[in-house]
Design a protein with these regions (language model features):
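Conserved C-terminal "lid"/linker of ANL adenylate-forming enzymes
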Residues: 20-22, 29, 76-162
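AMP-binding/adenylate-forming catalytic core of the ANL superfamily
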Residues: 1-85
């Protein structure tokens, strides 16, 4: 699939619930993406909807949040389908990352640009899951906290169809 990832990512980040998006599709059969939710916007939405959560990891794993993100992606896909040159860029699968992409973890530059090559390596297991028939994937990664300490994050990540 020939596509411009930044174009899709910027369309997705237009939604207040999506803080960051990373799209994949180069030399793949279809386009997929990682989504980072905006904890403040989605947290406020969750409170209004009565969806309880204990933090980012918990909120990002909620089915209601996945549906909210799916609605945003569906709107982007509808726009893409209106342009014949962009029909091949329709997003078919996505996942909500259990952690925020962070410059301290080398996933973003200090100016918040996605470091694609690093993400392709660090999140290979999740990218592979997007292009397989599984509907979830166990994931573990190192994280750096604001005070410089490091830790580990384990999560079962849902793979969702658009």
């Amino acid at each position: 699939t020939l596509f411009a990832p930044q174009f899709l990512e910027n369309k997705l980040k237009f939604f207040p619930y999506i803080k960051e998006a990373v799209c994949f599709g180069d030399q793949k059969d279809f386009v997929s993406c990682f989504i980072n939710i905006d904890i403040d916007a989605v947290g406020n939405w969750a409170e209004k909807k009565g969806v309880g959560y204990s933090g980012y990891v918990d909120l990002s794993s909620k089915l209601e949040v996945a549906e909210l993100v799916k609605d945003c992606i569906s709107e982007v896909n509808e726009d893409l389908l209106k342009e014949k040159d962009l029909k091949g860029s329709v997003i078919k699968k996505f996942l909500v990352l259990p952690k925020e992409l962070d410059a301290d973890d080398d996933e973003l530059t200090r100016t918040r640009k996605v470091r694609r090559n690093f993400i392709n390596e660090k999140y290979k297991i999740l990218i592979d899951a997007l292009y397989s028939s599984v509907d979830n994937c166990d994931f573990e990664t190192k994280v750096t906290f604001e005070d410089g300490r490091t830790g580990s994050l384990k999560a079962n990540v849902k793979i969702l169809n658009c």
